[in-house]
């Protein structure tokens, strides 16, 4: 494990930095990534970043897994016994780095995603939370009034230094051999926790606010969109090369309601990032997005993640091939015989086509997933070659379904 002393020494020795986003970001006081990390030609960039941008001529699809660092790994379980608090594990630089690197060392995925949580930035905007073993996240004072929205603060990065420090260390540790991913929650998804006070199966409070207190909800979502935008820029300036936006509970909304209450705030974020950090690909993942695919295309993101309930070939037809896709092997296939998993990987890759595809699961890795299956997933992906899989095929230009 990387010690606190080693962490401090690394950060003290970090070179002078220059922003990887547009230069006028300097006025915001956000930390900036070092020039050595910011300048790389397309051919030097990680495979995942190039696939996210939809570049031609890649040899194979890159692969990573949502929740690839975590509870299914024996190494993580041993660490969690020594550090039983999830908040400690996800808010301590040396632990974040160690946990993030565990699957990288074991399986060498093409993407290494920061070990964190979508709720991590909440205390930095004035919303404290706890995590209960039985209930999950708990927010003692749910935000449901105009006065409470006014009390929210601009995001304070002094309270998130562990995120920036971890990303800087990870970018150096990975050393260009994979893409470093950061992530955020979408405003609607974060708001579900803030309004409901934690996890919920019904979303009745926040859904009713759409009608009973729409101005309060708009104020909350707008504040979250601003904070999340700044948080993305902070992650990019600390070393993240690609950002995934999780609208985990957007799929709990009827499509027309998602269009009104989630999509505009995602677009607000994307528009700002495309101005401030135009070279950083953005991935949008919504669990249960089969009814939303066509509505997701004009959010401005570079990649749309598909969950496993959407057939990849159908998803590609509906989205067209001018936008990249991510996914979407059912996590349960990792419990199947390895030849079955191999066949499913081949099916998904062939369905996605030879361009603009990041192989992933359709959801996070399940708790008891065999590590052997995870290793096999990445071994198979590394063995793939587009020129063999699509030999003699002519790529059809697909326009998104209107």
UniProtKB/Swiss-Prot annotation:
PROSITE patterns: UROD_1, UROD_2. It is an enzyme of class 4 (lyase). Substrate binds at residues 67-71, 86, 116-117, 193, 248, 363. The record marks 117 as: Transition state stabilizer. It is found in: Plastid, Chloroplast. Its EC number is 4.1.1.37. It comes from the Eukaryota. Keywords: Chlorophyll biosynthesis, Chloroplast, Decarboxylase, Lyase, Plastid, Porphyrin biosynthesis, Transit peptide. One of its GO terms (biological process) is protoporphyrinogen IX biosynthetic process. Pathway: Porphyrin-containing compound metabolism; protoporphyrin-IX biosynthesis; coproporphyrinogen-III from 5-aminolevulinate: step 4/4. It catalyses: uroporphyrinogen III + 4 H(+) = coproporphyrinogen III + 4 CO2. InterPro entries: UROD/MetE-like_sf (IPR038071), Uroporphyrinogen_deCO2ase_HemE (IPR006361), Uroporphyrinogen_deCOase (IPR000257). GO terms for cellular component: chloroplast. Residues 1-50 form a transit peptide. It holds the Pfam family URO-D. Its main location: plastid. GO terms for molecular function: uroporphyrinogen decarboxylase activity. Belongs to the uroporphyrinogen decarboxylase family. Homodimer. Catalyzes the decarboxylation of four acetate groups of uroporphyrinogen-III to yield coproporphyrinogen-III. This is Uroporphyrinogen decarboxylase 1, chloroplastic.
């Amino acid at each position: 494990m990387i010690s606190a002393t080693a962490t401090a020494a690394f950060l003290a020795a970090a070179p002078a930095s220059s922003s990887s986003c547009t230069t006028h970001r300097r006025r915001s006081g956000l930390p900036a990534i070092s020039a050595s990390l910011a300048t790389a030609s397309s051919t030097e960039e990680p495979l995942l970043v190039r696939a996210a941008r939809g570049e031609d001529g890649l040899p194979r699809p890159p692969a990573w897994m949502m929740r690839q660092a975590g509870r299914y790994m024996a190494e993580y379980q041993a660490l969690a016994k020594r550090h039983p608090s999830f908040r400690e594990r996800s808010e301590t630089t040396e632990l974040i780095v160690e946990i993030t690197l565990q699957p990288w060392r074991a399986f060498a995925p093409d993407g290494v995603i920061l070990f964190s949580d979508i709720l991590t930035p909440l205390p930095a905007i004035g919303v404290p939370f706890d995590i209960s073993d039985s209930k999950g996240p708990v927010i003692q004072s749910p935000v449901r009034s105009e006065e409470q929205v006014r009390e929210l603060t601009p995001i304070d990065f002094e309270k998130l230094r562990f995120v920036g420090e971890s990303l800087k260390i990870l970018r150096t540790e990975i050393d260009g051999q994979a893409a470093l991913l950061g992530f955020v929650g979408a405003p609607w998804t974060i708001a579900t926790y803030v309004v409901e006070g934690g996890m919920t199966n019904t979303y009745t409070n926040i859904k009713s606010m759409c009608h009973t207190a729409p101005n309060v909800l708009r104020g909350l979502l707008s504040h979250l969109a601003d904070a999340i935008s700044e948080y993305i820029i902070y992650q990019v300036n600390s070393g993240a090369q690609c950002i995934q936006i999780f609208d985990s509970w957007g799929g709990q909304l009827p499509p027309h309601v998602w269009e009104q209450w989630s999509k505009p705030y995602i677009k607000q974020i994307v528009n700002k990032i495309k101005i401030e950090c135009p070279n950083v690909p953005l991935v949008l993942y919504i669990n249960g997005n089969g009814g939303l695919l066509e509505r997701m295309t004009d959010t401005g993101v570079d990649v749309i993640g598909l969950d496993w309930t959407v057939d990849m070939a159908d998803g590609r037809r509906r989205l067209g091939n001018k936008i990249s896709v991510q996914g979407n092997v059912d996590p349960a296939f990792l419990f199947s015989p390895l030849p079955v998993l191999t066949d499913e990987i081949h099916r998904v890759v062939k369905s996605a086509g030879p361009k603009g595809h990041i192989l992933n699961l359709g959801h996070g890795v399940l708790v008891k997933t065999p590590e052997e299956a995870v290793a096999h997933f990445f071994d198979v992906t590394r063995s793939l070659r587009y020129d063999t899989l699509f030999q003699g095929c002519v790529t059809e230009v697909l326009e998104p379904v209107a």
